[in-house]
């Protein structure tokens, strides 16, 4: 059921580069942390592969802005910019999607089948990445609380995820949450991708 994002697209576009730089900085700080504080891919080992996952896509548009823009388009715009910046800095990346489509397999016909297949394929992409780290991009929606804003990071149950989420959150608080800092939180088991990814995962929304 569609819900609405009470944020203007012009604001999102202005913030996009800042968010990308925040994520980029957090990933590199996390990777270069001292060995005794890093639990995944410590300095000197094979570099990680960042799997950039723009949430939703295709028929699954996610939430909808007050101007009629679907969440899937916003996620994709941010995901492409994050991917470009990471690659520009020499970071190996993989994207789960690079255009506004579902990545379900052939044979999925109903909306439910397509959604289930799409999620399974995203999990497969993450789990196939060498030394993978998942960064899933979403937009939260709280139409009953229009004063609520900002970005928050959530981690999955894999080793290293909490440290990365906290690094991302600290950078987000400095960049865009200065008035109302947020805390990174553990993601519950209800999010299929985060639950089944066999790599440290951070969902930002």
What residue spans do the PLM features occupy?
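Catalytic-site microenvironment of enzymes
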Residues: 1-205
């Amino acid at each position: 059921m569609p819900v609405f994002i009470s944020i203007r697209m012009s604001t999102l576009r202005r913030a996009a580069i800042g968010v990308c730089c925040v994520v980029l900085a957090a990933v590199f700080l996390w990777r270069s942390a001292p060995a005794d504080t890093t639990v995944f891919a410590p300095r000197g080992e094979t570099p990680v592969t960042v799997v950039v996952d723009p949430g939703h896509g295709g028929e699954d548009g996610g939430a909808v802005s007050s101007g009629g823009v679907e969440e899937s388009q916003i996620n994709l715009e941010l995901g492409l910019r994050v991917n470009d910046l990471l690659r520009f800095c020499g970071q190996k990346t993989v994207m789960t999607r690079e255009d506004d489509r579902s990545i379900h397999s052939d044979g999925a016909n109903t909306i439910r089948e397509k959604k289930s297949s799409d999620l399974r394929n995203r999990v497969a992409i993450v789990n196939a990445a060498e030394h993978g780290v998942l960064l899933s991009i979403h937009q939260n929606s709280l139409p009953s609380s229009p004063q609520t804003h900002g970005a928050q990071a959530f981690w999955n149950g894999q080793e290293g995820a909490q440290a990365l989420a906290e690094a991302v959150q600290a950078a987000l608080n400095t960049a865009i949450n200065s008035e109302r800092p947020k805390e990174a939180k553990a993601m519950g088991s209800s999010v299929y991708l985060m639950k089944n990814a066999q790599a440290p995962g951070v969902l930002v929304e």
